Amino acid sequence: MLAVHFGAGNIGRGFIGQLLQKAGYEIAFVDVNAALVDELNERKMYRVQLATTGKPESVVEGVRAINGQDVAAVAEAIATADLVTTAVGPNILPHIAGAIAAGITQRLTVHARPLNVIACENMIGGSEKLKEHVYEHLTESVQAQAAQWIGFPNAAVDRIVPLQQHADKLLVMVEPFFEWVVDSSQIVGEVPAIEGVTYVEDLAPYIERKLFTVNTGHAVIAYLGYQLGMKTIDEAMRDDRIVQATRGALQETGALLAAKYGFDPQVHGQYVEKILGRYTNPLLSDDIVRVARSPIRKLSQHDRLVGPALQCMEKGMNASYLGLAIAAALAFDYPEDAESARIQASLKEFGWENTLHNCTGIPAGHPLEEIVREQARRLKEWSGSH
């Protein structure tokens, strides 16, 4: 069995690649980093280390790599593949769509058989979005065939892979915890047998649970930690105020998730505590500025902070701690981040209210606006005291 995986970075190798290899797939990584591609082709294996006591290691073998610039070679691999996966980042999906389309076209011309393309990205509806991009490169007749033979099942993925540097360029350290949930209703043909993958009929609750817990929590810590002059996530989690605010925000999102999807509050509470424990693991330590980057995307109306805050307000629930995190994200002043620079320029030119409305989609006069304003005042007291 062959799996073609786009993105030979730490997530690709340390998470998706490892699970695919354990499931018996030969893996062809696709990446534009020529040095990484050469290294993988030379060694045909790499090591994965767990970020826990003793740092236990496993070896992933039977791998090769294709340079993403070589569209013909990528298309040829997809034409014979049993599965295609991605872990490239939401912004890169449009750039790999052409090669995937070429592979699908070649495949359907030679022999029509089912193929599933799973985007393992930190976004809602990643595979669906990738499908839209891919279909832009397909002729109408191939689109009609693809609708029958090619599945794009959405997925929710979760595994922290910290920033790291090793003498061995291919070695990757990952946390022991992981979650990979796939929407089985969108699969074409047989469901791939991959140990560690959870297949569900309705992915929405799992995507939102992850986004509104892991990503929300990470964002709260990063934006508040930055205001207090901290450098890493685990350092920030040694500050009681940040722990309280993070737990508070996750209680707000937890109440929302229980109301929307019927998650058992006790079971969800245990999940939250597990997530909080991940943030305090020094081996998983991440740079605050990396986690906080792209604040405009993270402040958008349906993302990790504003999304749950607006929904909490609609249900008459509390969103004070989420409001505090939104205020901190607006105050994230890191000139090297283009989105941060745009927010700060907007604050100077158009003022706080207009910037809030434009960045978040929170309507003028919405009760959440007043909460964020109040929390912004509180934030000034916080940052003035460190």
Swiss-Prot record:
EC number: 1.1.1.17
GO molecular function per UniProt: mannitol-1-phosphate 5-dehydrogenase activity
Binding site for NAD(+): 3-14
One GO term of the biological process aspect: mannitol catabolic process
Reactions catalysed according to its record: D-mannitol 1-phosphate + NAD(+) = beta-D-fructose 6-phosphate + NADH + H(+)
Any Pfam family hit: Mannitol_dh
Any one cellular-component term (Gene Ontology): cytosol
Source domain of life: Bacteria
UniProt keywords, alphabetically: NAD, Oxidoreductase
Entries under InterPro entries matching the protein: 6-PGluconate_DH-like_C_sf, 6PGD_dom2, Mannitol_1_phos_5_DH, Mannitol_DH, Mannitol_DH_C, Mannitol_DH_CS, Mannitol_DH_N, NAD(P)-bd_dom_sf
Family recorded in the similarity comment: Belongs to the mannitol dehydrogenase family.
Name the UniProt record assigns to this protein: Mannitol-1-phosphate 5-dehydrogenase
Biological classification of the source: Bacteria, Bacillati, Bacillota, Bacilli, Bacillales
